[in-house]
Design a protein with these regions (language model features):
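Peripheral, non-AAA+ core regions of ATP-driven protein-machinery
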Residues: 4-14, 18-81, 86-92, 99-115, ...
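Conserved Rossmann-like nucleotide-cofactor binding loop
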Residues: 124
């Protein structure tokens, strides 16, 4: 039989699409300098392998029984997933090295009564066992494997018939059908497609663990994130022991949901009331401190906003921000100068969201601008007040979403007063008892109530 020749294609490292010739700019994603040469062995065409799968009427599907989710045994994980793992779903779990991806994946496995398969191409079975012992993970249904060939993994799935498969990690798995190294764009794309077929055809849940690049995105083609049903990120840093599990994409639930965990020696521990965690060490005797109820998905979390304003002694004033958008802070400082006459041109400004949280909710504007003004004037704010509102360029305080949810969280933690946009307050049918709600139309009115 004559030897089959290889075909040359050019694969984009950004989007994963291939092209018959080289371009300086990828025609699919418009990224520059991302196409690389790749050899693909030509395969003989096969005849028709069978009839296509029959289609189904939507009405028949809706009349059938609702697909039941599988609880993971961890309430915070179930919250982010939308109620548990859905059979047939492909889930991508990403995060920095050492953040807790493998730990979380191992901790959910004892909740399954049917067989589960944990594949770690980075560790041996004995090493996985040591980790499981430290986490107190013990289950007769848990099967461990260090296989790194996708073909071998599929054979093990056929043998074990698991309810859940965990792949740790997608960057270390490869296919014999390709000549490229594990972790390359082509290998990740091929293995991802085979795992997607595995999940859909066998109706089992598959969790893929992925590493992040230095830019903070999952290593490999962007197509991988489009391919999967759910994309989860674990966020955190070495300076704090809490971890945030966030859903960036969820076809079967709400995106941007978060679960809060605390990293301890025996694994990730759920935090039932994250607001208390982030406010536990707040000081009441300093200026520049405000409280803002952030919405993370459907969950309200009270966050302390700290600001420090001091004279600039080294020429150009500094603007340092932690957890808040730098450009948005610059806009708020301009509003302070133009609309309220508080000069910031010769002041260093530092803004910090306590606990390492990162917030992009515009409703935090009023809390941030008030914290800066409090520090600039060195005046204390009432300790039991909550600030909510988006600030416009004219200094107006604009309405925000789901004010009632934010207020209920503040009331539950003992706060007595809320300053919110007048437009939101007027739309409230009933005001909750035990907490005073003051409506403001601009930042000046809020300052008049506070200072």
């Amino acid at each position: 039989m004559p030897q089959l020749k290889s075909k040359i294609v050019y694969l984009c490292s950004a989007c994963g699409n291939d092209h018959p010739k080289w371009y300086g700019q990828c025609p699919s994603c418009n990224e520059w300098g991302t196409l690389g040469e790749f050899k693909v062995s030509k395969k003989r065409k096969k005849g028709n392998s069978g009839l296509a799968r029959d289609s189904r009427k939507l009405s028949d599907i809706l009349q059938g029984e609702e697909v039941k989710r599988i609880p993971t045994g961890i309430a915070e994980m179930d919250r982010v997933l939308g109620g548990g793992l859905l059979p047939g779903s492909l889930i991508l779990l990403g995060g920095n090295p050492g953040i807790g991806k493998s730990t979380l994946a191992l901790q959910i496995l004892p909740a399954f009564t049917k067989p589960v398969l944990y594949v770690s191409a980075e560790e041996s079975e004995e090493q996985i066992g040591l980790r499981a012992r430290r986490l107190n993970v013990n289950s007769d249904t848990l099967h461990l494997s260090s296989e790194n060939r996708i073909e071998g993994i599929l054979d093990q799935v056929s043998l074990i018939q698991p309810e859940l498969v965990v792949i740790d990690s997608i960057q270390t798995v490869f296919s014999d059908a390709l000549d490229s190294l594990p972790g390359s764009v082509s290998q990740i794309r091929e293995c991802g497609q085979q795992l997607l077929q595995l999940a859909k055809q066998r109706n089992i849940a598959v969790i893929i663990i992925g590493h992040l690049t230095k830019e903070g995105i999952i290593a490999g083609p962007k197509m991988l994130e489009h391919m999967v049903d759910v994309v989860l990120y674990i966020e955190g840093d070495d300076r704090h022991d809490h971890r945030i599990l966030r859903s960036a994409k969820n076809r079967f639930g709400t995106s941007n949901e978060v679960g809060i965990f605390k990293m301890e020696s025996n694994g990730l521990i759920e935090v039932k009331n994250p607001s208390e965690l982030f406010l536990a060490e707040r000081r009441d005797d300093i200026s520049g401190s405000t409280i803002f109820p952030s919405l993370e998905g459907s969950r309200p979390i009270l966050v302390e906003v700290q600001a420090l304003v001091s004279n600039a002694n080294f020429g150009t004033p500094q603007r340092n921000v932690n957890g808040f958008d730098f450009k948005r802070l610059a806009m708020l400082l301009a509003v302070l100068e133009k609309r309220l006459g508080i000069l910031m041109g010769t002041q260093d400004v530092f803004v910090n969201l306590v606990g390492g949280l990162k917030i992009d909710d515009p409703a935090a504007d009023l809390a941030v601008i008030t914290a800066v003004a409090s520090s600039a004037r060195d005046k204390l704010l009432p300790k039991s007040v909550i600030l909510i509102g988006e600030v416009g360029l004219g200094g107006e305080v604009r309405s925000v979403s789901r004010l009632d949810t934010r207020i209920n969280e503040a009331k539950a933690l003992g706060f007595k007063s809320v300053i919110a946009p007048t437009a939101n307050v007027k739309r409230m049918k009933t005001q909750p008892k035990g907490i005073k709600i003051s409506g403001v139309t601009n930042v000046g009115e809020a300052f008049h109530l506070l200072f």
